[in-house]
């Protein structure tokens, strides 16, 4: 049934991909998801919006320190590289290349930046590369944050003209 869609955005929440106690990737869960993505990717353009950078990075920063914005941003910078590595490693098994795109609210509200982001995603998809998108939490301040990646995923779906948005 999903194969009838031409463009799909899959949004993955922190609790789906990161073990909340261990602050590590749920590796087996991600492997199963990547297998499904590989099957769908044969006939459908896919974009993944993935949360979890702060949750992953918080393992390296004391929990009490995560009260300040700059500490959450530091955790995001630590966790984001792990997220990208996991996606790259898991999808490489299926000969699928991935890219990383980090967006802020301004990237979808400023016309020039919106078009640039859309064109970048389109260019990647035309090369059968799956963009893995997250909010750029290392630079986003409270005033310019999406708030959560559900909103970011909806905006990306609208940006690329997706036929389906899946929230996990």
Task: Specify the residue positions occupied by each region the protein language model found.
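Nucleotide/pyrophosphate-binding catalytic subdomain
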Residues: 1-168
């Amino acid at each position: 049934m999903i194969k009838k869609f031409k463009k799909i955005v899959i949004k993955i929440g922190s609790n789906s991909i990161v073990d909340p106690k261990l602050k590590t990737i749920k590796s087996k869960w991600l492997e199963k998801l990547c297998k499904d993505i590989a099957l769908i990717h044969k006939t459908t353009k896919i974009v993944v919006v993935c949360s979890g950078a702060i949750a992953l990075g918080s393992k390296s920063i004391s929990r009490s320190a995560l009260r300040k914005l700059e500490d959450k941003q530091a955790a995001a910078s630590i966790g984001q590289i792990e997220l990208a590595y996991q996606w790259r490693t898991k999808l490489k098994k299926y000969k699928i290349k991935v890219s990383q795109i980090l967006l802020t609210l301004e990237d979808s509200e400023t016309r020039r930046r919106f078009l640039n982001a859309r064109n970048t995603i389109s260019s990647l998809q035309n090369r059968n590369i799956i963009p893995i998108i997250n909010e750029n939490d290392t630079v986003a301040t409270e005033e310019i944050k999406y708030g959560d990646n559900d909103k970011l995923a909806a905006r990306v779906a609208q940006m690329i003209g997706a036929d389906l948005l899946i929230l996990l």
